[in-house]
Amino acid sequence: MVAGQVWHTPTQLFSPHYGRALARYLVTEYKLHLFPYHELVMYELGGGAGTLAKDILDYIADEEPDVYTCTRYRIVEISERLAHQQKERLARHVECGAVEILHRDFLQWNEDVNDPCFVIALEVLDNLAHDVVRYSTDDLQPYQGLVSIDHTGDFAELWEPVQDPLIKRYLKLLSNVRPSVLPPGAPVYLSWLPRWLQRWLAEYMPFYPNLTAPHYLPTGALQMMDVLRQHFPLHRLVISDFSSLPDTIPGVNAPVVQTRHKGEMIPVTTYLVLQGFFDIFFPTDFIVLRDVYLRLMGTTPEDGFAAVEPDAGVDKEYTTPASPAAYFTPTYPRAFDNPAVHVASYEDYSRAPDSLFSASDIVPPPLLNETHEARIMSHAEFLARYAEVQGTQLRDGSNPMVSWYANACWLLT
């Protein structure tokens, strides 16, 4: 990494207000749906310096002491250095048993977590691995991209028919949720040109492109969703990331590739750059992400959309919900007046009695009317609803925490 290259996230810039806004959302949803029968369990993917975790836990400890006693915050961190830094920063909450640092790769997770939990991933998707494909202008078949490095260290792209099972599965999911005559990035004229003419142009026309523009696939995000589906059956997602980015390289869902030189950010036009000296950020198509997520969560083995578990079919009975809703809410009991009644795994307490809330609680109505929904919110919309905006308001009335990062969105399930 280039010396002095620092990236500031809203969590860092607006600490503690940004983390407190997320904490208010989490506590609100917890009180409406789980309190007091379950613990508040949270998994944060990639905790960075521990700023978000500290701000969330400080808020709960100071403002919601009853909730804090049953809070379990787990950070899944792949970096040993950051895991050590998080443990030092969160020492107060570690001593109280409210936080646990798990030094591991979430994409390699292999343990079942059957508790209702929130999975938090802020500024994670933009750094996850992507694959790139291009489509033949002859028959629209996809070709996967490979990078070759010669003896001098120069990079070159190679294209071959798609063989990677992860790419195949993502393309199958994408075509299911976004059926289209043309693949992403294909020129519009291919939709009305006869097939014989397409082949003739590809074979005989000088300078006619034989491949479409690159299409970057979020296969790393698909791997993350596989883990959630296989091992976190009662999770709720809290994702925030960039929906668009400036200065991207050519292609569909293409990233920004940039480095710092003499204190100035320099974007480049290719991802074929020297490793360790450039940062690569991918935008997230939140609408496609939501649809792929819901389709994957409601899939069956016969669909061929889900990843095959290593022990699938070996002394393990496979059960799948009939619809995505079953991943979030099996049943909704209404007998609140009888605490002895057995309560299902993920309850709906949106009609809970006032006794569940203290007199000082100001609890917004639930974001999701139906638990199988996945809601996309703008950065400003989420903060206007849950943030204590007076803490970041300037003298002229503007509020940078709300107005900045206009190219960011939230996905909440």
Regions from the language model: what does each represent?
Residues 1-43, 49-117, 133, 287, ...:
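Rossmann-like AdoMet
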Residues 8-13, 183-413:
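Long, Lys/Arg- and hydrophobic-enriched amphipathic alpha-helices
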Residues 22, 119, 237-239:
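Beta-strand elements within well-structured catalytic alpha/beta cores of enzymes
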Residues 51-53, 82, 127-129, 246-249:
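Short catalytic/ligand-binding loop motif for oxyanion handling, primarily in non-cytosolic enzymes
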Residues 104, 109-111, 126-143, 193-201, ...:
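A short, conserved alpha-helix within the catalytic core of class I
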Residues 118-194, 257-262:
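A mobile, often basic/glycine-rich helix-loop segment
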